[in-house]
């Protein structure tokens, strides 16, 4: 009889322990059920990108002086600049400019070092095609004005990180009552006015 009671007691302890483990696992599940969804319903919802987003390159043909700085600073020598020397004006005349976005790494060096600012990064990132040769943009395709996500009536623009659960990106701030190193811009202005 004692052996039977001991077995029942052991079984009860194991059942309680198993219930604890199941409860711990389900607590994680229920915790995630209370959070907001993390995914974005992509074709119908798009994130508003930051100003410094490096998307498709926009090219202004009239500003380009065919100096080929963009080719020299590109890590893979990607932009193709075709020009001819005009003997009358003694200047280069740009004939053709192209960038293959299938190869481009979107580093932004060409935009940064361009002396005439004829290149700029846009917020376009939807460059998918069925044929990789369609990713080779010539000066006409590069000159096409970029679109903005916020101007598309079929898309719900979402603020950056607004879709994340609350507390997911809370700043790691200083303890209450302590000061940051240095001065804030407002404090510098106040000091200069005094």
From Swiss-Prot:
Pfam families linked: Fer4_7
Domain of life of the native organism: Bacteria
Full protein name: NAD(P)H-quinone oxidoreductase subunit I
Cofactor field: [4Fe-4S] cluster
GO CC annotations on file: plasma membrane-derived thylakoid membrane
Gene this protein is translated from: ndhI
Location of region: Disordered: 173-194
Similarity-based family: Belongs to the complex I 23 kDa subunit family.
GO biological process: photosynthesis, light reaction
CC cofactor note: Binds 2 [4Fe-4S] clusters per subunit.
């Amino acid at each position: 009889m004692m052996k039977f009671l001991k077995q029942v007691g052991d079984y009860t302890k194991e059942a309680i322990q198993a219930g604890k483990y199941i409860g711990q696992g389900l607590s994680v599940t229920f915790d995630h059920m209370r959070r907001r969804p993390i995914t974005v319903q992509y074709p119908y919802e798009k994130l508003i990108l930051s100003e410094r987003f490096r998307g498709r390159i926009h090219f202004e043909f009239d500003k380009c002086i065919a100096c080929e700085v963009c080719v020299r600073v590109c890590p893979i020598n990607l932009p193709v600049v075709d020009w001819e020397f005009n003997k009358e004006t003694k200047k280069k005349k740009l004939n053709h400019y192209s960038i293959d976005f299938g190869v481009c790494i979107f580093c932004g060096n060409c935009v940064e070092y361009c002396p005439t600012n004829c290149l700029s990064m846009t917020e376009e990132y939807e460059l998918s095609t069925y044929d990789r040769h369609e990713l080779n943009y010539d000066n006409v395709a590069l000159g096409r004005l970029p679109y903005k996500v916020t101007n598309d009536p079929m898309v719900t623009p979402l603020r950056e990180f607004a879709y994340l659960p609350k507390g997911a990106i809370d700043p790691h701030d200083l303890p209450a009552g302590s000061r940051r190193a240095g001065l804030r811009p407002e404090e510098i202005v106040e000091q200069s006015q005094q």
